[in-house]
Design a protein with these regions (language model features):
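Single conserved hydrophobic/aromatic residue that forms the stacking wall/gate
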Residues: 1-8
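Conserved alpha/beta-domain cores
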Residues: 17-32
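C-terminal helical cap(s) of enzyme catalytic domains, especially alpha/beta-barrels
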Residues: 45-63, 133-148
Length: 164
């Protein structure tokens, strides 16, 4: 009896967004049915850019554990400059497959509630924000301290050193 591996890939590329959508739909459909052992995302660009999206597809399907960042889509209640905060947290977590769900939310009104399933997170407010762990507020901090406090808490929870 032979054991064969089935490689899931779409041998088409395109701009980043197009490639990610095509690959997510195509490969995700196969993997969700239990079809496939390895995956490849095809992007017109450096092959290194294919790794993170492939891991994310596997995480979304529950086939791989690791760091998951959730953030709000922003609305009129967003009181902080959210995108740089998301970028800083994402960069600090690069290369770490820590099984934590981390939230970076734009407002303290909805943030902690919408991210109640997160292990740890921050939610912005006017010049200050909240640090929360598993839905419970653990600190109210000045806005400029939020990301570092979040990264400190991640390091404490995971017992690792992040890329700062």
């Amino acid at each position: 009896i032979y054991t064969l591996s089935l490689h899931d890939a779409l041998p088409i590329s395109g701009p980043l967004a197009t490639s990610l959508i095509r690959s997510s739909v195509g490969i995700g459909a196969l993997l969700s049915e239990g079809i496939g052992d390895t995956v490849r995302i095809s992007i017109s660009g450096p092959p290194e850019e294919e790794i993170a999206p492939a891991k994310e597809i596997l995480r979304c399907l529950g086939l791989r554990k690791g760091f998951e960042l959730i953030s709000c889509p922003t609305c009129a209640r967003t009181k902080i400059d959210l995108l740089p905060m998301i970028d800083k947290v994402t960069k600090a977590m690069e290369g770490h497959d820590i099984p934590l769900r981390v939230a970076v939310m734009g407002c303290a009104v909805n943030g902690p509630g919408e991210a109640r399933d997160a292990d740890v997170g921050i939610a912005g407010g006017v010049k200050e924000g909240l640090l929360f762990r598993r839905g419970e507020i653990i600190a109210k901090l000045p806005q400029e301290e939020l990301v570092d406090a979040l990264l400190d808490e991640i390091e404490r929870m995971a017992n690792v050193t992040l890329n700062r």
